[in-house]
């Protein structure tokens, strides 16, 4: 249900009005997602790419358990992770209550690792 994209009603309305958005995926994509999730979590202990992993705690469009499992298995020196409790699926398109801390965390992470300001 598109209602769970964001707490921002305009984001939901824009999504529903977009003719390119639909509720179907191909069988090939579904298979890839089903296979890649567990495979990615299995590689988490050897993950070497600096990563900021953020997920929505109230996501009803995808199960956040995969993000949580990856975060718990990955080296904390390489993967910084955070669950934004109460936020819906589109973290960057949420209401300011949710989006502001998301964007602040991204900015802080980029500055700390790459000297880049978002």
Predicted regions and their residues:
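Alpha/beta-hydrolase-fold enzymes
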Residues: 1-28
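Short beta-strand/loop motif that positions the catalytic acidic residue
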Residues: 47, 53-55, 59
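Short alpha-helix in the alpha/beta-hydrolase fold that links the catalytic acid
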Residues: 49, 63-73
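Acidic catalytic loop of the alpha/beta-hydrolase fold
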Residues: 22-23, 58-62
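Active-site nucleophile elbow and catalytic-triad environment of alpha/beta-hydrolase enzymes
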Residues: 25-43
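Conserved strand-to-helix beginnings and helix N-cap segments that scaffold or border functional pockets
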Residues: 27, 63-67, 95-96, 103
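Catalytic active-site module of serine/aspartate enzymes centered on a nucleophile-bearing elbow/loop
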Residues: 78-118
């Amino acid at each position: 249900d598109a209602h769970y994209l964001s707490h921002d009603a305009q984001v939901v309305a824009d999504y529903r009005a977009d003719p390119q958005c639909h509720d179907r995926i191909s069988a090939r994509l579904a298979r890839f997602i089903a296979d890649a999730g567990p495979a990615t979590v299995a590689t988490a202990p050897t993950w070497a790419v600096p990563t900021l992993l953020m997920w929505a705690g109230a996501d009803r469009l995808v199960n956040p358990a995969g993000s949580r499992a990856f975060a718990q298995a990955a080296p904390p020196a390489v993967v910084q992770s955070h669950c934004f409790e109460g936020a819906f699926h589109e973290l960057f398109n949420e209401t300011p209550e949710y989006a502001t801390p998301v964007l602040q965390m991204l900015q802080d992470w980029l500055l700390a690792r790459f000297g880049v300001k978002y």
